[in-house]
């Protein structure tokens, strides 16, 4: 009985931690339990004395502070990693949303499913059905990329006329004031037609002058610029990246010095600016330049510090000395992008966005707005492109035949085709879910990094898979090629607005560990403010948090999550339970990693990256489950749900295993392994059988396939190869039973080629009627159009001689 009572006590202690019972109530329960065991004669009643001696200091605040919290507080202040101003502003910026629940070890699934699903307004739907549809029809991507290296003038005019560049601008200034969800839908539709078109529309509606002016501009700046931006009268760009400072924006060498100077014949307070920027989208044609630079005030003319820090200003590009107009040439996807320079240019101090009072506030302004732009534009562009590619590749896999069968029936093709379908579903779920949060008023900085990284990364992998499937059809450029420019341009999305290597290894967990953790940010604030009282309360909540996640990790690992709460009892039930377990694992690993590695965790980028991977996969899986629920839990969609969640579970567990295999403290790694994997690893990647089911969805018209491609431009127009492939798929499927019947009548397995010739012969023999012959003839026309590639006169591929600059510039840092 003594052994059983000890086991029961351990179980009780674990239950108190598991259910996160308060310290005071837990102490009372333990005292009552010990007393009961004493009365029962199992334990000595005198055990209450040492137990009380242990518990009393924890529950009496003055004693607890002096004996425990104060020494820990002093140690914490010593080991707390140093934080630059830009890092602090990045962490303080934005808000925490659903990712905070995932990080805390106990997700509230009811809360997730109660988030309202966005709906398009009548105005937004009309814009998608009208101007967006027409812009897609007008876009000839091969002409844009190969012949013009730009959008045609009539398309530029159409975009300005219908205020495509004003989706984020409020109606009071003449903008459209669309929701984040509507912006995402617009960009997805455009990107399925032309990457250049989507980038051109997306950038002014992302981080740039319009967004910054609405949040921080003076009334005079808003009233002057916003109506002009809304009408397309002004074309904006924003210049942040320098040759010497790409991802490390805090190190920009571009400078501004506050001084008096002459402006329009008068002496005014202003700034002398010097900058050298590159990779600036829309810079070659911009009329107003948003500029980030480091501002100093050596004579203290503004009355504050000498070194004010990063500042943002708006400068008309007509200002004398502004160098603009030259273009970069990004990977044969020549959207308007180029360098801008200025040397010792004087402008009035009022050019600062928000006026002089916002001097030195530029980095905070940028990071507060970046989460919205980065969470919408890049994920939407990548997602829209992959959705269209998924439909087109699935159609091509059905139409294209080798060895007398559709290549889509070959297992070697099914594997990458399933990845394309699964990624399209997951990416759309992830890109949509973040818009829910933005529409609720959140600025989810960590989520925007997750969605940017994983949508662009999965987008690139999916396009590579599509190229493997289509072969020569994807390689040969021309008007009928739906894939090659997306393939060439995929690294662009990977690189911009936080290169993906940096985003994964530093930003996701680097911000998430502090921003999403329930206590660390407040503990750091308490340490900085020398507030031991606040630290005391947080410390013991934090200890309880770690204890809870330790117990939850072990128990849920032992039971494979079977005892944890789930909001549903259907085919997705086990997924919620697995995610409960992984959430507890992540919370435990995060706390232990921060405790053991301290400030060095910042430099242990591969550990940080793997912790970020776990958080990311938890988000992607929960986005899939949310999408499945929002769309009505269609059973036909389950193969995609299974694929998306199983892939996420496998990747998350793999990341944890890799982390533990490489954790520098091997003793701690062993203890963590025992807690997290008490019975070993459990999750497998999607099976061959599941891949078969998912790949099949893309190859025949069905409701699930339509949901994968929801909102894309699928009209079979002259310059829309995706729409033409969709039409060809329908034509070929209509012809297939007729072809099979002819084969049966003739007793031959005829190839699915020369269907027009076959139709004439079968009609002459009375095997089919005229309508069926017409179906076969149309299918042959569509089939040939789908599998053929473009060819050109030799001179059509030559380019004009490139005029080299007279002076060779010094090689800039890579």
Curated annotation (Swiss-Prot):
Its cofactor is FAD. The active site is at 497 (proton acceptor). Disruption phenotype: Cells lacking this gene show undetectable in vivo beta-oxidation levels, and are unable to grow on oleate or decanoate as a sole carbon and energy source, in contrast to the wild-type parent strain. GO terms for cellular component: cytoplasm. Its EC number is 1.3.8.7, 1.3.8.8. InterPro entries: Acyl-CoA_dehydrogenase (IPR050741), Acyl-CoA_Oxase/DH_mid-dom (IPR006091), Acyl-CoA_Oxase/DH_mid-dom_sf (IPR046373), AcylCo_DH-like_C (IPR036250), AcylCo_DH/oxidase_C (IPR009075), AcylCoA_DH/ox_N (IPR013786), AcylCoA_DH/ox_N_sf (IPR037069), AcylCoA_DH/oxidase_NM_dom_sf (IPR009100). Gene3D superfamilies: Acyl-CoA dehydrogenase/oxidase, N-terminal domain, Butyryl-CoA Dehydrogenase, subunit A, domain 2, Butyryl-CoA Dehydrogenase, subunit A, domain 3. It is an enzyme of class 1 (oxidoreductase). Keywords: FAD, Fatty acid metabolism, Flavoprotein, Lipid metabolism, Oxidoreductase. Pfam families: ACDH_C, Acyl-CoA_dh_1, Acyl-CoA_dh_M, Acyl-CoA_dh_N. Induction: Is under the negative control of the global regulator FadR and the positive control of the cAMP:cAMP receptor protein (cAMP:CRP) as well as the alarmone ppGpp. Is induced under carbon-source starvation and in the presence of the long-chain fatty acid oleate. Induction during carbon starvation is cAMP:CRP-dependent and sigma(S)-independent. The keyword Protein transport does not apply. Pathway: Lipid metabolism; fatty acid beta-oxidation. GO terms for molecular function: acyl-CoA dehydrogenase activity; flavin adenine dinucleotide binding; long-chain fatty acyl-CoA dehydrogenase activity; medium-chain fatty acyl-CoA dehydrogenase activity. GO terms for biological process: fatty acid beta-oxidation using acyl-CoA dehydrogenase. Transmembrane segments: none annotated. It catalyses: a medium-chain 2,3-saturated fatty acyl-CoA + oxidized [electron-transfer flavoprotein] + H(+) = a medium-chain (2E)-enoyl-CoA + reduced [electron-transfer flavoprotein]; a long-chain 2,3-saturated fatty acyl-CoA + oxidized [electron-transfer flavoprotein] + H(+) = a long-chain (2E)-enoyl-CoA + reduced [electron-transfer flavoprotein]. The keyword Lipid metabolism applies. Catalyzes the dehydrogenation of acyl-coenzymes A (acyl-CoAs) to 2-enoyl-CoAs, the first step of the beta-oxidation cycle of fatty acid degradation. Is required for S.typhimurium to utilize medium- and long-chain fatty acids as sole carbon sources for growth. Is needed for bacterial survival during carbone-source starvation. Belongs to the acyl-CoA dehydrogenase family. This is Acyl-coenzyme A dehydrogenase. It comes from Salmonella typhimurium (strain LT2 / SGSC1412 / ATCC 700720). The gene is fadE.
